[in-house]
Amino acid sequence: DVMRNLLTRLRSGGLVALLGDRDISRSGVTVDFFGEPAAFPAGPAMLASLTDAPLFPVTMHYEGSRAIAVIQDQIQVPEFLPKRERVAHMTQQIAGAFEVGIDQHPEDWHMLQQIWLADRGPQ
């Protein structure tokens, strides 16, 4: 089971890299993304909340032929919120971190699927 493997890896201090702007399951969290409602995956925030693993959004861009990874500020688990709201709050922060990276290097961000809810067809 994929989720169990991810949880085990994180609880043992391992690293897990996930795409944070691709709601492949189409059951993600609705966030504000560049001023419009968009769907982002709940997985990164949910895993961090369940395991207390640090969550760092990473954005990438190119400088010439070199790929540059930028580790954004850590997203803290908001313990003061109920569990369901924690994931939504953290996912909104992930979206905000991606907005910063995309604003700085829009030419290096590529949408592989519809992210904004207004662009998606019927579920």
Which residues make up each language-model segment?
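Non-catalytic C-terminal accessory region of glycerolipid acyltransferases
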Residues: 2-123
